[in-house]
């Protein structure tokens, strides 16, 4: 670990303790509260020590407003990312896909890049495109390029909204080659800490099936529907002083809506945990 400390400018034991405290204590407490296996926590600590964050992207490393709740899904995700895999989170609305993405970027201590896919997304939006600066043609780096450069976590939101020919440029980035070839520019090798996490919903307008070649480059995790403990965990983060009976009643309301939406009795538009939190704040 000496080289890591040296790069951070840490020269003695006292400074090393401060380094670990500032970068790790809060994350470790969250993981222990979730009862994550100590072996995984130890490997995460080593990951933090191994890869420092460049100064110009440190503002992208931040604790999310809502943290994910769910030991099994968290352990699966952490283990896969530690092995160097990319994740594809599939599930219905309000299952915590984006919350999990943000939580994983935070607990790994990596800069987060959010990439929202849509029907008009193309390779230039992802990798970058030529631009004219000071009478010179230069590359305007896209979010995928920046993830590769700085060891970021790329959140590929609603990846099944984009056309297959647009996301095909990611094949070499997502598989064992871990590189980006840009015509007219140098080949970029991915930083060893770079990971990508895709999210997708089925059945929404504009969505499509992902081709097998792309899906095979991810570890796919099917997100379960939220239960009472999960909803209460989210509500307690927003309302730590709220009455237990009131929070439990709101959680029950959300779960009732979830059941009705699942059976097609009501529209899934009403199934919105963010909306529930906003409604509680307004009361």
Enumerate the predicted regions with their spans.
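Conserved AAA+ ATPase small/helical "lid" subdomain
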Residues: 240-283
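AAA+ P-loop NTPase catalytic core and its hallmark functional loops
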Residues: 19-252
